């Protein structure tokens, strides 16, 4: 009985220690298909490798937040870091700029990554 209590306490202590570990998210912005002006596509922002799980992700068009955005469920990897995919339908053209802005405890200010249409 005493041994199982000690084991349970060790498990709880190790789990509480996970919250202290912080990892900055990796941000990847890409389109589902190669960009063609005037042709509908999907803009994706894949955010991975972050811890803790609290995160704010916005897709931007010309610096303004896009309202109609969907995202995957929060998931975690084998190393207990988290990942998410945010996406929206869009139609690229020559004049509009698209980006993904991420706020996380590991950043002193939000980080913005622009979509490179050549990637």
UniProtKB/Swiss-Prot annotation:
Residues 25-114 form the Ig-like C1-type domain. Gene3D superfamilies: Immunoglobulins. GO terms for cellular component: extracellular region; MHC class I protein complex. Belongs to the beta-2-microglobulin family. Component of the class I major histocompatibility complex (MHC). Involved in the presentation of peptide antigens to the immune system. Disulfide bonds join 45-100. It is found in: Secreted. It comes from the Eukaryota. InterPro entries: B2Microglobulin, Ig-like_dom, Ig-like_dom_sf, Ig-like_fold, Ig/MHC_CS, Ig_C1-set, MHC/Immunoglobulin. The gene is B2M. SUPFAM superfamilies: Immunoglobulin (SSF48726). Residues 1-20 form the signal peptide. SMART domains: IGc1. GO terms for biological process: antigen processing and presentation of peptide antigen via MHC class I; immune response. This is Beta-2-microglobulin. Keywords: Disulfide bond, Immunity, Immunoglobulin domain, MHC I, Secreted, Signal. Heterodimer of an alpha chain and a beta chain. Beta-2-microglobulin is the beta-chain of major histocompatibility complex class I molecules.
